From Swiss-Prot:
Gene that encodes the chain: glpF
Residue spans crossing the bilayer: 8-36, 42-62, 87-110, 146-171, 182-198, 237-259
Broad class of the protein's primary localization: membrane
Species per Swiss-Prot/TrEMBL record: Buchnera aphidicola subsp. Acyrthosiphon pisum (strain APS)
Record topology, Extracellular segments: 37-41, 111-145, 199-202, 221-236
GO molecular function, one term: glycerol channel activity
Residue ranges that the UniProt entry lists as topological domain Cytoplasmic: 1-7, 63-65, 81-86, 172-181, 260-263
Catalyzed reactions: glycerol(in) = glycerol(out)
Keywords for this protein: Cell membrane, Membrane, Transmembrane, Transmembrane helix, Transport
Short motif (NPA 1): ranges: 70-72
Membrane topology according to the record: Multi-pass membrane protein
PANTHER family membership: AQUAPORIN OR AQUAGLYCEROPORIN RELATED, AQUAPORIN-9
Domain of life according to the entry: Bacteria
Protein name, entry field: Glycerol uptake facilitator protein
Non-traversing membrane segments, not crossing the membrane: 66-69, 70-80, 203-206, 207-220
Native organism taxonomy: Bacteria, Pseudomonadati, Pseudomonadota, Gammaproteobacteria, Enterobacterales
Length: 263
């Protein structure tokens, strides 16, 4: 029994690793292609690719791991007593590693173009001029906004996302969606729509692993501490893409439980 459980958790962690990685590969790959080649994707196209990537990753991993693909989601399910506490840390580590390794894969696929761009534009990693390149991989809040404003936007965006996704997957009130496997497609559309509406105001992550994995990678490939701060003196901004989604996910989950699914 213990061997079976061990194999089962390994399989689930792999699906979280690979599913989160797929989201990163499609999304960051799109950003890299847009900034380093002549692809010139529009904001709409970039948002759609992120959304489709989320849908594909959910279809891939949901039957085995539940397709959390997001530490904020995992923490919410744990605090809601819907996830065994023994799975929390393995899931979060797997999601972050998936984000890290698939970002690294994308980084090395585009490495020659990245170096060429730096040489042609006299960009030195770890300087303010390198923020544009770093933003291919990482999420940096709009530093022209106040910390409180950016933090609230991140919390609101994630709360909205979780609230709607929970209702998509509510087998009691959305029996058709739940049983016809439409929810992953709608979840991808939701990611696309939130990005289109919110990103012009502030860059959002919705997912701590989406931000932390790439920043760890960049810190090891020449950007150093700049990868975390984005050159901003206010260190608090670093926590927005990590703590914002965690607080937002739990807020959205609480609203859904209290106002919608309280029967």
């Amino acid at each position: 029994m213990n061997i079976y459980r061990k194999k089962n958790i390994i399989k689930k962690c792999f699906m979280e690793f690979f599913g989160t990685g797929l989201v990163m590969f499609f999304g960051i790959g799109c950003l890299a292609a847009s900034k380093l080649t002549n692809a010139n994707f529009t904001q709409f196209e970039i948002s759609c690719i992120w959304g489709f990537g989320v849908s594909i990753a959910i279809y891939f991993s949901s039957s085995i791991s539940g397709a959390h693909l997001n530490p904020a989601v995992t923490i919410f399910f744990w605090l809601s007593s819907k996830l065994n506490k023994r799975k929390v840390l393995p899931y979060i580590i797997s999601q972050t590693l998936g984000s890290f390794f698939f970002t690294m894969l994308t980084y090395y696929l585009y490495n020659n173009l990245l170096i060429s761009f730096e040489r042609n534009n006299n960009v030195v990693r770890g300087t303010q001029e390198s923020l544009n390149l770093a933003s291919i991989f990482c999420v940096y809040p709009n530093y022209n906004n106040s910390f409180i404003y950016d933090f609230i936007i991140e919390i609101f965006s994630t709360a909205l996302f979780i609230l709607i996704v929970l209702e998509f997957n509510n087998r009691n009130s959305n029996y058709f969606l739940y049983n016809r496997s439409v929810a992953p497609i709608l979840t991808g559309f939701l990611v696309c729509m939130i990005n289109l509406v919110i990103n012009p105001l502030n860059n959002i992550s919705l997912n701590p692993a989406r931000d932390l994995g790439p920043k760890i990678l960049l810190s090891l490939t020449g950007w150093g501490l700049f990868s975390f701060t984005g050159g901003n003196d206010n260190i608090l901004y670093c926590f927005i893409p990590i703590m914002g989604p965690i607080l937002g996910a739990n807020l959205g989950g609480w609203i859904h439980k209290t106002l919608i699914n309280n029967s």
